[in-house]
Amino acid sequence: MSQCVPNCHIDDTPAAATTTVRSTTAADIPILDYEVAELTWENGQLGLHGLGPPRVTASSTKYSTGAGGTLESIVDQATRLPNPKPTDELVPWFHHRSSRAAMAMDALVPCSNLVHEQQSKPGGVGSTRVGSCSDGRTMGGGKRARVAPEWSGGGSQRLTMDTYDVGFTSTSMGSHDNTIDDHDSVCHSRPQMEDEEEKKAGGKSSVSTKRSRAAAIHNQSERKRRDKINQRMKTLQKLVPNSSKTDKASMLDEVIEYLKQLQAQVSMMSRMNMPSMMLPMAMQQQQQLQMSLMSNPMGLGMGMGMPGLGLLDLNSMNRAAASAPNIHANMMPNPFLPMNCPSWDASSNDSRFQSPLIPDPMSAFLACSTQPTTMEAYSRMATLYQQMQQQLPPPSNPK
């Protein structure tokens, strides 16, 4: 059995194969449908006679495909060709089965872009052209070759098949040259597009994450700075006595006033030269006695036979202290003012040696200093200091 199958060349442009069916004048021999035939020589020619029951033809399903009945229709069309007039050909049934198989194998199953073109040529019964699975464009450029005649039909129909060496190009639906739209390409598939979108979203999310992280670090540093400021303000509020302000501006105003008053007090103490205020009570009393003895040399007794030595009248000193109740205990008398120290001489007049006590404004100032340290006390001390500065006489310039 000889079958004609078109050759497939990958690099060539596909071309359609044509099949030309030509009838001959061979005589139709109905004995071909029998299983057993008898050869006889009649009148110088070879004849066939069928023996036995007729043969039942079965349809071949070897080359059938699921193309919706297209291949079956082509095979059926080829088998139902009209029988031509009988001719005197010898043994016309040798290639009876191979003709149908050749036509079945030579047919290409069409796809979506199918082009059916039926052409009839003079001298042939039917010619069928079947399109390939590519576009609807016309295919050409193949090599044409003639195939040896074959017998088909009921008996004496001879088929002459003109074939082309068809080249089929293996096309990839995912290549960029064969795709018209990007959405039809396999390369631009949905998972790949989703991956690209995820990459873009990942880049945006990384930028937003960096910004949020920087903002969080900035907020944390600002929070620490505010906590430090609040802690310093609380410590400063504790240093200011009787401070009841809560807002920062009022607290700072109180601190400023307090510092001004402290500065006035320090300047007053430095001008008056009062280091004894920093000494304990016993040392202050001892210093008072020493200064009183040194400042009043006339109070020394001379009539007791002890020249250069004298004793202090403690009773008179106590009476003088009792006669001046307005003087504070911490008050040190002015060392330049003589104390009331009468001598042991009874004939002497006490009035000559008694010096009147000069009221000192520092007593009131020091009395205020013993009170609890408040803003009013500091303001009162500052006022007294100003009055003292006004009452002091201007110093005389020696010539």
From Swiss-Prot:
This is Transcription factor UNE10. Induction: By cold treatment. Down-regulated by jasmonic acid (MJ). Accumulates in far-red light more than in darkness and red light; this profile requires COP1-triggered protein degradation in darkness, phyA inhibition of COP1 in far-red light, and phyB-mediated protein degradation in red light. Follows a free-running robust circadian rhythm, with higher levels during the dark. Mainly expressed in stems, leaves, seedlings, fruits and flowers, and, to a lower extent, in roots. Homodimer. Associates to PTAC12/HMR/PAP5 which acts as a transcriptional coactivator. Interacts with the Pfr form of phyB but barely with that of phyA. Binds to COP1. One of its GO terms (molecular function) is sequence-specific DNA binding. Its main location: nucleus. It comes from the Eukaryota. Residues 119-158, 173-228 are annotated as: Disordered. Residues 213-262 form the bHLH domain. Stabilized by phyA but destabilized by phyB. Accumulates in the dark but not in far-red light upon MG132 treatment, a 26S proteasome inhibitor (at protein level). Transcription factor binding to G-box elements (5'-CACGTG-3') in target genes promoters, particularly in far-red light but barely in the dark. Required during the fertilization of ovules by pollen. Repressor of phytochrome A-mediated far-red light responses including seed germination, suppression of hypocotyl elongation, and randomization of hypocotyl growth orientation. Does not inhibit phyB-induced red light responses. Residues 178-201 have a biased composition (Basic and acidic residues). Gene3D superfamilies: Helix-loop-helix DNA-binding domain (4.10.280.10). One of its GO terms (cellular component) is nucleus. CDD domains: bHLH_AtPIF_like. GO terms for biological process: de-etiolation; DNA-templated transcription; double fertilization forming a zygote and endosperm; negative gravitropism; negative regulation of seed germination; regulation of DNA-templated transcription; response to blue light; response to far red light. It comes from Arabidopsis thaliana. Pfam families: HLH. It is found in: Nucleus. Ubiquitinated and subsequently targeted to protein degradation by COP1 in the dark, but not in far-red light. Keywords: DNA-binding, Nucleus, Transcription, Transcription regulation, Ubl conjugation. Disruption phenotype: Plants exhibit unfertilized ovules but normal pollen tube attraction.
